[in-house]
């Protein structure tokens, strides 16, 4: 009889809320976590979390030492991958909004077939909380508080992406301009579907 293998979850620790993610995973699941800063550390984990933080800073730090390529390879390997806020931006296949992405050509790791809009809900001072519906099959817990701090929004999902929850909220002025650009693309006949945000 063999002992069960210990599950080890890596948390990208270049910048952002990596310690908070570690604490939540360890308390909530009992799984071991490690902070991931180098490509070598990816060899010893069963899944990875890309935490919230500042996606531009994460991208700049990750571009050193082959880390970005190693992260892309890891996410494409099929191992479990989770992105929170800035982490979701990095995992998106496409991103709009925010000068850091448009002007500086911030690279994305990709792997998640979504189009995101950075800072959809505005600046730090525009942050807010609202009730967020639980995913299908988990409604017995009721709504939970969604926290939107300079939060991105998912504007489009690929056909293989399962949407677990939706929030209807008003974008900030900058995001409204991005949405207008998408409306123009739709008018031209380009295939753009906006789901989950109004």
Predicted regions span which residues?
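Amide-donor transfer/coupling interface in amidating biosynthetic enzymes
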Residues: 1-2, 118-198
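A structural micro-motif
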Residues: 7, 31, 79, 106-107, ...
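Short glycine-rich loop/turn motifs that provide flexible caps or phosphate-binding loops at active sites
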Residues: 9, 15, 51-52, 82, ...
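Cysteine-nucleophile active-site neighborhood
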Residues: 55-136
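Short, functionally important structural connectors and interaction interfaces within domains
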Residues: 34, 50, 101-104, 108, ...
